[in-house]
Amino acid sequence: MSGPSSANPAASQDACYISLLGLAEYFRTSQPPNIKKCIQCLQALFTFTPPSKVEARTHLQMGQILMAYTRNIDMARQHLEKAWNISESLMNFDDVKFDTASLLAQLHLQTEPSSNAAKAMLRRAVELSQNNVYWHCKLLLQLSQIHASDREYSSASELLAVGADSAEEAGATYLKVLFLLSRAMILMIERKTNDVLALLNSAGQIIDNNIPNPHQKEYLKVFFLVLQVCYYLALGQVKTVKPSLKQLQMSIQTIMAPNWPSDDTIFGSNQLEMFVWLPKEQLYVLVYLVTVSHSMMAGYMDKAQKYTEKALTQIEKLKLQEDKPILSVFKVILLEHIVMCRMVMGNRELAIREIAAARDVCLAAPQRRSLLKRHSAQLHCLIGLYAMSTSFFDHAERQFLVCVSETTERDLKLFANLNLAIIYLRTKRETDLKQILDAVSTENTHTYSSQALMGGFYYVQGLHAFHKNSFHEAKRFLRETLKMANAEDLNRLTSCSLVLLSHVFLSIGNSKESMNMVTPAMQLASKIPDIHVQLWGSAILKDLHRMSKDAQHEKEAYANHVKYSENLIADQRKCVQSSHHELVNWFHGDPPITTGAPLTLPVIPEAINNPVTPLTPSSAAVAATAGAAASTTPMTQTNVAVASTSALQPPVGAVAGQFGQFY
């Protein structure tokens, strides 16, 4: 008799737990949810002095509810800390223990200026999870992402290498490839070119030969191809990348087909396969992004604009479903790219509106501090290009100097310095010009930079030689630029070099060679279209036709020159009247809030007299550390432009939960 009677209290208590949990879930899932009553039901569980495991689980559930449905972060933290203190030493309680650690780390990141507490929590959890492959790998990914966000790339890379080894020991091939590709992404941001190639080759062979599930294989292929495309773009290899980009576009179409299974179906059956880099809808936007980057670098501004508008439309659709932070990252990078397109085409007024739109996205994003911090240097660079193209050289110089001081990205720094060199050239500051060219030359003899940026460097040297009337030296530099540009189909760099070479030949009285240079320059400029090269080229053509006494063609060239000039002057007038023009005075802190006409993307570009053209740097890389997503931009300018910035960092940094960037 004593047996049944002693068991009854325990059975009765279990029934109470179950009833209260059921009620809590009922209130949580009601329409609308009744979170207050849900929390009251969970709190009532503690009155029964439950066993340790029940108490820890209930504290975890309270923390989850408070984080998801309320702003009571302090109470959420208290419950999660209690759950961790109870569960840390309990055996066979991994889900509660490590879920709590993961959530506490997230909460520390949200509420504390430093990530140290989050890292310490995850390091302890990683140490305790070594016998649970799923949680060990999940926590390694989370910790590596925090290190990557803090630009501690070596630490992130080491953690990802540990994850790859753990996955291999567990026979989890799919997960191992995710770790390898995530590590390749980090190494790409570090510009460890040889290591990136080795990892990509290793991962590519495994994808081809050791992934039996066709859907997982295609998904990994998209991740692999995104990194491969970004790798080539970061090196300015626009022509070399074309086959990989085409493959990527075909793969994403396969994944987005109506008959393709849902991500839950593909990744939901095996715990060690429940990891994805990005869901397919976000991958779709990312492929648009790298396509935009490629179009910009290749000098196809119309294509870049078209794909940007499609990508932005897709982002808005996804935001209506769920406003994920990565969508804000993608949007900022796309706006940075489209700004470059507008300036090349002579529509600076729309460019400054889009810079303001990018600022608004940074300020409105939930991860405001990190997003603005990550894109501040790019925004200063873009504003510098805008100020340069509207002849506000003092403002442009200060913007580029701020960019150089804020960024740790070598290519962005080089890009800003090249534009500074052009400003010093235009304003006849020979000492400053020599100093910056010497510094750029010294630094880049020891490092391998993007083909596009190095071509831009030779172009600036050619422009400098031209202004010194050192025409032989100018030809030497410009031929080097043309060799690099032609090798990789860098059309804008080609057109700028050709028009400057034409001017060189015109200056030494060789009208035949001048015509041979300016004709293809104008054809390319029309195809891009680049109004600055068209303005310059039409002036050269007018002089050439006057010299050959061809009055009709001289008249046509003059009419074209007037048309381009008037378009740019009209646009200049709109720029200085725009409230967003005030952004040229932003040099520190948060960017000022300006008001103006709302941004509507499809706008016919207009066109500056005697323009200073932006140079256009190289890359667009999109990276991500394992299961999340991060972001980047290129740029440049001169009395004719050559480079461009917009994501002077690869979209490789745009995909890791929130980390990275590039353009």
Curated annotation (Swiss-Prot):
Top-level division of the source organism's lineage: Eukaryota
Stretches forming TPR repeats: 455-488, 495-528
InterPro entries with a match to the protein in the record: MAU2 (IPR019440), TPR-like_helical_dom_sf (IPR011990)
UniProt KW keywords: Cell cycle, Cell division, Chromosome partition, Mitosis, Nucleus, Repeat, TPR repeat
Gene3D superfamilies attached to this UniProt entry: Tetratricopeptide repeat domain
Coiled-coil intervals: none
GO process annotations (BP): cell division; chromosome segregation; maintenance of mitotic sister chromatid cohesion
Keyword Cell division included in the entry's annotation: yes
Major localization listed first in the record, in broad terms: nucleus
Gene Ontology CC entries for this record: chromatin; nucleoplasm; nucleus; SMC loading complex
Cellular localization per UniProt: Nucleus, Nucleoplasm
Pfam families: Cohesin_load
Family listed: Belongs to the SCC4/mau-2 family.
Stated role: Required for association of the cohesin complex with chromatin during interphase. Plays a role in sister chromatid cohesion and normal progression through prometaphase.
Subunit comment: Interacts with Nipped-B to form the cohesin loading complex.
The protein's name: MAU2 chromatid cohesion factor homolog
Species this protein is from: Drosophila willistoni (Fruit fly)
